[in-house]
Amino acid sequence: MDHPEDESHSEKQDDEEALARLEEIKKSIEAKLTLRQNNLNPERPDSAYLRTLDSSIKRNTAVIKKLKQINEEQREGLMDDLRGVNLSKFVSEAVTAICEAKLKSSDIQAAVQICSLLHQRYKEFSASLTQGLLKVFFPGKSAEDLEADKNSKAMKKRSTLKLLLELYYVGVIEDSNIFINIIKDLTSVEQLKDRDTTQTNLTLLTSFARQGRIFLGLPISGQDEDFFKGLDVTADQKKSFKKAFNTYYDALADLLQSEHKLLLQMEKENAKLVNAKGELSEDSASSYEKLRKSYDHLYRNISSLAEALDMQPPVMPEDGTTRLTAGDEASPSGTVKDTSVPEPIWDDEDTKTFYECLPDLRAFVPAVLLGEAEPKSNEQSAKAKEKLSESSSEVVENQQTTEDTTEVSADSASMDDRSNAEQPKEKEEVEKEKAKDTKKEKGKEKDSEKKMEHEKEKGKSLDVANFERLLQRLPGCVSRDLIDQLTVEYCYLNSKTNRKKLVKALFNVPRTSLELLAYYSRMVATLASCMKDIPSMLVQMLEDEFNSLVHKKDQMNIETKIRNIRFIGELCKFKIVPAGLVFSCLKACLDEFTHHNIDVACNLLETCGRFLYRSPETTLRMTNMLDILMRLKNVKNLDPRQSTLVENAYYLCKPPERSARISKVRPPLHQYVRKLLFSDLDKDSIANVLKQLRKLPWSECEQYILKCFMKVHKGKYGQIHLIASLTSGLSRHHDEFVVAVVDEVLEEIRVGLELNEYGAQQKRLAHMRFLGELYNYEHVDSSVIFETLYLTLLYGHDTSEQEVLDPPEDFFRVRMVIILLETCGHYFDRGSSKKRLDQFLIHFQRYILSKGHLPLDIEFDLQDLFANLRPNMTRYSTIDEVNAAILQLEEREHASSGDKVSIERHSDTKPSNKSSSDVISSNGKSTAKDIRENGEAHGEESDSDSGSGSVVRDGQNEELDDGNHERGSESGDGDDYDDGDGPGSDDDKFRVRQKVVTVDLEEQADFDQELKALLQESMEQRKLELRGRPALNMTIPMSVFEGSGKDHHHFGRVVGENGEEVLDEENGEQREVQVKVLVKRGNKQQTRQMLIPSDCALVQSTKQKEAAELEEKQDIKRLVLEYNERDEEEANGLGTQILNWTSGGSRGSTRTGEGSGKSGGSRHRFYYHQGGGGSYHARRK
């Protein structure tokens, strides 16, 4: 439990830190106000003052070049340079340089300071700068602009917009109408047609909305409100800005809706293709992934803009195809199998309805169109034929009678003609009219018969086309409603020929479309009630195919065999295939239980084995078959795959008896911890959760809290950083807990690599993300991250288990690396960590290329990763290119390490020691004793005029060597180099490592001779040089330095050639300064001492110059030491990795200790953000 005193102390400390931050914010606002006031009312120097400054072209050109590389580190130096030059004639060049500068977000304030300085000095600078910056948003359509990199142009626009806003806030730019033109161009609806331009404009508008809330009339909270009150933004301008943003946001919402509809349509089409063909083509999958990625990116950007505008993000209607839903967890309470109660045949009501509730065709189709109505129609046609024959015989009789009557009438007529000669003409006319009428009737009958035949032919062709279309729709019927509708439609096209075609189409189902077998079987079962020949023909064809496949005994056509046996099983569940046929097929497979027969038997049992086992009439026989199956499995020496198949089929038919599932009972304290971490934790409640965790009895709950922290995969993926923040918060009070968390995370990552289980992939990704967040909160070092990255790539390789641990087709390790680098890789942008990340990314590319073809999602993630971390890095396309790059990298490292080794060897040899001692003695009167005395001072100023700088450096190095080898400074001049195991042991060490290299003796001798000559020449030259002397503008005779210290005791403080103040020893008052004047008499040069007043301009300028040089040296020395300490912290893991060096072990340990001591504050310094609910820990800055 925490003591109240500790809590009060921590709360007091938090309050003090909050007050300090508020004070810093207040000072920053006051500085901005002062700068704004100076820019609005600039006091520009006159032309006379500007003429006194440096106006040379060379100096101005150098300063303008520096303006192209503005950053925070060079700000002060650049401003000093600008104050010392006259840029009146180079204002346009300075503006161009500033506009071309590649500014980062951290460099914006430095650019504002520099622009303010130029604005306060040159009147025309502000207008020229405004025009130059606006050209970034409204460029001319030249070829270079069109071919420029879109990514770099977007980044340039973003930084320029931020710079314009900041310049407006500080008064360099006073016209706010320029932002109206920019916003109108960005919110143009015409640009929505281009996807890339829309994404770029969205990011720019979001940045403007966040930084320029005053333009949109949005509320401003905090102390910034006083600063923004002074800005002159009219109500009309705010209205114009707000209208442009709202109009553009509405257009974006419509665009997002259309994108969503298009995505849904494509998903539905893909679903149809998958159902019809079983897979998607590469083009379809690629286009879908591209559209999906574009939609997600657009949605994220629109949500960010809505958040910046204080609006609700658009809500898309959810659809089953666009969201992933997790199934409900299994019921915690199970039931024990009771053999006394008969088990249901079907597992659920839907399955029972599918197999038992078939549609009644007589209720949807007229009986005439069904097969059972054919006999009646045949009888009717027979009767009609009889009637037609009877009527035809009657017509023949009538014709005969008419002929007889005509003959009789003709005879009588001839007699009448003879008797009555007056009437022949009238009878002839009547007979002609009758003949014409009969001819007309016969012609009409022929025409009607032709029309009937033509209509019948048209009807037949139309029926054939409709039936072909129906068969084409058959593979797409993947639901109960679709297959039932198709069955009804077929009844309208029923005929004997069509029934044969239908059976053939059902039999030739694609062997890879096994999901269609159940629906085809339902269609057959539905038609079997009216068309008895369809099921009989299909069953006969399936049985013949099974017999032919079994009797061939070849190991071919496994897919055809599985399709055949599963079709038989599905028809068995519809009771179309008798159970005896199924048992005979199963017995045929069990009689020869090898190879494909095992797969066929298992597929048959998986299809209808459970149905037969639970049916009362077949349960006994099925039980016997299952027992035979298990006995054969135990007797046969089956491979693991076949053994698993048999067990799955057996337990699917006859599940084992299991006890009831017992739900886990947790103590209330554990339930409360889980509620805090998995239910209550979010960004608003993190402070309260941290407070509640600290209130818990830590001795009882520590292990369980650690266990829950390790279950980050059971929570939301987006809340992993909150768990890391809680870890950071708890570290202030429980240091050992953080160590345990880091150890557990690293152990879990390694265990995941060792097991490589598919079911643990979500857990492994969550742990990689957690490790990255722990680095962000400064709980692990970069060395841990890089060790984990290399472990992920290399673990298990070059071993016998490589195919199991990291198969060639498995890309999960690539995803793990992507997750870790996406989480914390953006912090590796400087120092040694940047170099190490560059090296790792090259090795990472080799690992990727060794895998083969990448899936689309992995490729897209890799593109995003390299774009975010190293956009300019080369992506290699072949393994040879990346191997060449790695070889070149290793050669560079080997060359650099070889240079270091040679430098250490030559610096530790005796000739170099001798030459250094000669140089010291030649420069002045310093000896080895003086070196030791000065070396112990660690940088104190020497009273000697000669060689002070070199003596101090050598003394520092000597002290480090003394500390490393545990020796004092009592030894003589050469003891520091000859005693101990210093350089000699290093040299021996390198020789041992190089024994494997075979060197030609003649070449080695030539090399040693040339090296010796080179060193001798270098030493001869160094003897004549003056070391540690201040550089003068003239050559000074050696006689000057020989007697430079004669009168040291007469004055309190004496200076050589530069001159220093001379103090009287008695009263210590400042008198005069002693200098030496070089004169020439004849051919001889002599020096004479001269006293000049201390307030003279020469003395004052000399003193200022020396003081500035000394301060610069101290700053450079401090910066170099700090950089070395930070570099060693990153490389050595904060002092936890002790390097066992033989010659410099103590030095490494000493510096590591210092680095860790200094970095301890930075590593365990946590930042707090004040919120409504308290404070929580933020990530590294």
UniProtKB/Swiss-Prot annotation:
Residue segments, region Interaction with UPF1: 999-1023, 1066-1111
Region listing for Sufficient for interaction with UPF1 C-terminus, in residue ranges: 981-1181
Domain MIF4G per the UniProt entry, residue ranges: 61-264, 469-655, 672-871
Compositional bias annotation for Polar residues: 398-412
Region (Disordered): 309-348, 375-459, 893-991, 1129-1181
SUPFAM superfamilies, A to Z: ARM repeat (SSF48371)
Biased composition annotated in UniProt, kind: Acidic residues: 972-985
Annotated segments matching region Necessary for interaction with UPF1: 999-1102
Keywords, sorted A to Z: Coiled coil, Cytoplasm, Nonsense-mediated mRNA decay, Nucleus, Plant defense, Repeat, RNA-binding
Biased composition (Basic and acidic residues): 375-389, 415-459, 893-911, 927-941
Gene null: resulting phenotype: Seedling lethal. Accumulation of mRNAs with premature termination codons (PTC). Photoperiod-dependent altered development and stress responses; in long days (16 hours light), altered organ morphologies (e.g. epinastic leaves, small rosette size, long seeds, some abnormal flowers and stunted stem growth), disturbed homeostasis of wounding-induced jasmonic acid and pathogen-elicited salicylic acid. Increased resistance to Pseudomonas syringae pv. tomato strain DC3000.
MF-aspect GO terms: mRNA binding
Gene3D superfamilies: 1.25.40.180
Residue ranges, compositional bias (Low complexity): 912-926, 1142-1153
Coiled-coil residue spans: 6-41, 260-309, 425-451, 539-559, 1000-1021
One GO CC term on file: cytoplasm
Region (Binds to UPF3): 735-755
Biological processes annotated in GO: defense response to bacterium; jasmonic acid mediated signaling pathway; long-day photoperiodism; nuclear-transcribed mRNA catabolic process, nonsense-mediated decay; response to wounding; salicylic acid mediated signaling pathway
Subunit structure: Found in a post-splicing messenger ribonucleoprotein (mRNP) complex. Associates with the exon junction complex (EJC). Interacts with UPF1 and UPF3.
General function of this protein: Recruited by UPF3 associated with the EJC core at the cytoplasmic side of the nuclear envelope and the subsequent formation of an UPF1-UPF2-UPF3 surveillance complex (including UPF1 bound to release factors at the stalled ribosome) is believed to activate NMD. In cooperation with UPF3 stimulates both ATPase and RNA helicase activities of UPF1. Binds spliced mRNA. Involved in nonsense-mediated decay (NMD) of mRNAs containing premature stop codons by associating with the nuclear exon junction complex (EJC).
Family, similarity comment: Belongs to the RENT2 family.
Record-given protein name: Regulator of nonsense transcripts UPF2
Species classification: Eukaryota, Viridiplantae, Streptophyta, Embryophyta, Tracheophyta
Name of the gene encoding the protein in the UniProt record: UPF2
